[in-house]
A protein has these predicted regions:
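Short inter-helical turns and helix N-cap capping residues of alpha-solenoid HEAT/ARM repeat scaffolds
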Residues: 36-37, 66-67, 101-102, 133-134, ...
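Structural detector for internal amphipathic alpha-helices that build alpha-solenoid repeat scaffolds
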Residues: 13-23, 39-53, 61, 72-84, ...
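Bacterial N-terminal signal peptides
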Residues: 1-6
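Amphipathic alpha-helical scaffolding segments comprising HEAT/armadillo-like alpha-solenoid repeats
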Residues: 19-32, 53-64, 83-98, 119-131, ...
Length: 193
């Protein structure tokens, strides 16, 4: 059984990918990407990320999937895997970050590109989305910034502002937003992220 690189990502640290994730092989998960059941598709794309680099071709293909949630998760998984799989996906991710109709997919692509080192170009979208009117989108932006880690230091001031405006007990604040901002700040300041 492969060791796990991180409890937060679940990406295998060992060069040898696991043979099964959630009881399924990589091929079974790839096949499930075409399921008519959205829950099965989303489980499959999440599981593919755990296979790491061995699933990179399937994750790159999933960036073109009809379902925006599959595209979102594929971009996020590639950002978490990093290395050669992320580098190979950069042209597709750049396209998604620039032209995708789904803001969520733009955010996930921007996250992945930040993990590839393109912070100056792609972190501003995530920072701007911290103030998005829909709570889930704003909280997702904070979570993605947190996953970038210490390299996202230019997001500290905006995250602090969101936390101050939305911390628990602030009248008119949204403690979900404030908590998401605080979690991101913790991850950015964690040198062992």
């Amino acid at each position: 059984m492969a060791s796990i690189a991180s409890a937060t990502t679940g990406i295998p640290a060992a060069a040898e990918p696991p043979s099964h994730v959630a009881g399924q092989t990589i091929d079974a998960n790839i096949s499930d990407l075409d399921s008519s059941d959205r829950v099965i598709r989303l489980r499959a794309v999440r599981s593919l990320g755990v296979f790491g680099a061995a699933a990179s071709d399937a994750l790159r293909s999933a960036l073109d999937h009809d379902d925006p949630a599959v595209r979102y998760l594929a971009a996020e998984q590639l950002g978490e895997i990093g290395d050669a799989p992320l580098k190979a996906a950069k042209p597709q991710l750049e396209q998604l970050a620039a032209d995708e109709s789904s803001l969520a997919v733009q955010m996930a692509a921007s996250f992945a590109l930040c993990r590839a080192g393109d912070l100056d170009k792609h972190l501003p979208l995530l920072i701007a989305t911290l103030d998005y009117p829909e709570r889930g989108t704003a909280c997702s932006a904070a979570a993605l910034i947190g996953k970038i880690g210490p390299e996202a230091k230019q997001a500290v001031a905006p995250l602090e502002a969101v936390h101050q405006q939305h911390r628990a007990g602030v009248k008119g604040g949204d403690y979900h937003r404030g908590g998401a901002a605080m979690n991101a700040l913790r991850k950015i300041s964690d040198k062992n992220n």
